[in-house]
Amino acid sequence: MPLPYVGMALRRLAWAVASCRLAPWTRGASGPLHSAPAARSDCSAPVFIRAPAFGDRLALIDQHGRHTYKDLYLRSLRLSREICQLRACADGDLREERVSLLCSNDVSFVVAQWAAWMSGGVAVPLYRKHPRAQLEYFIQDSRSSVVLAGPEHVELLSPVAQKLGVPLLPLPPTVYHGVAEDPEEGLVLERNWRDRGAMIIYTSGTTGRPKGVLSTHDNIRAVVTGLVHKWAWTKDDVILHVLPLHHVHGVVNKLLCPLWVGATCVMLPEFSAQLVWEKFLSSEAPQINVFMAVPTIYSKLMDYYDKHFTQPHVQDFVRAVCEEKIRLMVSGSAALPLPVLEKWKGITGHTLLERYGMTEIGMALSNPLTAARLPGSVGTPLPGVEVRIVSENPQKDSSPYLIHAEGSEENTKVTPGFEEKEGELLVRGPSVFREYWDKPEETKAAFTSDGWFKTGDTVVFKDGCYWIRGRTSVDIIKSGGYKVSALEVERLLLAHPSITDVAVIGVPDMTWGQRVTAVVTLQEGHSLSHRELKEWARGVLAPYAVPSELLLVEEIPRNQMGKVNKRDLVRQLYPHEKGAPEAGSQ
């Protein structure tokens, strides 16, 4: 290692150590709080273990340039050694200490994530648009022992890290350019990866406070290999990545899958309809042939198309290019409105592949790759995934629930008398998460007594496919691919000096899936406009959680227990809104 780099690294490490006032304690050793069935293979090593075999193949293209698999591996190895040096970890194993990371949508995220894993840590991805208070909560709740930050995020995270007494390690320029000089030392210690914690992703829950979903390396392997098989990933694929990197869709489906098989990922810093269309239609190599997004992005791409591709010959060209070059287009993270699916097919010739998943289970259901897809359905179970549709057993004699249908990749068996009966979806398999971080009671409550994860989603099996009917709980709003906790938004809005009561509801929306709407009562003599509320809320809420609509009412109806029936509230306030709950629905 050249001397200039050594000096720079030591200065950065010294800064990181100096910022640490309190040493975060590590979680005591304990086994998993539930056991998933064994995977088909014990080969649960992380994706970076596969990288050396791909060598000089092109792994990533971003605003910084082109990066090979060898580049990613050696840069990650170098950073992992810095992490271990900072944590005084002589044997190179952090033993599941948490490593928070805030990076842009570029090579820095991959290197930071791989480095966290190489050093034996659990990666905790953060999001730059989250308010500082929420970033502080994630770092503190996960008890991260170090925070990695891209240079553009150091200013945001520095005061947070100092307040919490957690060392902040800015990513060096070598993360973005160059390779290590001593590849003969480029080996990661042998470890038993299978049950080792890999990643904590924070997701909203019905309690309102975000919960950390801890997945193991084997959980991630199960999701990735299932998708690789189902969607026929190969090293020749080139995917365009435009999603944030703090949830499963962006991290696993769009990043780890291509890197698992030696394919190429083209990353944009953020979504731009113009740039996406330019990439689709470009003749430059490598050419995009896979795309995945949330329904909101497809709506925005169609808006751009309507404004800029007005000539018939241009529209014919767009459709021809998309049909010829692109093999797979996927929609997920929120329900796909049928008009969006139909219009997109008319523009590109592609019937969007709909699938179903969530942070706790990865991906569970998917439409077929080549066979006909039923619009609105989410297909059948992925490899290794078992599902059940159930309802409560009123007798509670032999089982706490009644099984309507039970399925796997091979087939689904429906219980006689329960044909096309709705129920809650249960999931079991090696992709199901290990635990809610530091929340044993909530982890236990999330599973049935016989080990199935309760998704909280109402589904039905008909026409050979599974159909999602909606959340069992109305307090999780899916807007633009994000999951928004209505209870958390309510809790924060009640801090506004003019608001006395609030109910946050999800109203069906063509573009966003659901729009976050705040129903509010005010202090006597006070006034509040939607613009004023948005300006105030931006300081405490993520952009996608800021209410897009404000309704002022004299009183919010509550029952004797003080609870709001939000389905009734949506029906009352939006009786003609398409997709609003029907009378009597539960």
Curated annotation (Swiss-Prot):
Chain segment of the transit peptide: 1-89
Keyword terms, alphabetized: ATP-binding, Fatty acid metabolism, Ligase, Lipid metabolism, Mitochondrion, Nucleotide-binding, Transit peptide
Parts forming coiled coils: none
GO CC terms in record: mitochondrion
GO MF annotation: an example: CoA-ligase activity
UniProt keyword Ligase present: yes
Enzyme class: ligase
Pfam families the UniProt entry points to: AMP-binding, AMP-binding_C
EC assignment: 6.2.1.76
Family: Belongs to the ATP-dependent AMP-binding enzyme family.
Protein name per its UniProtKB record: Malonate--CoA ligase ACSF3, mitochondrial
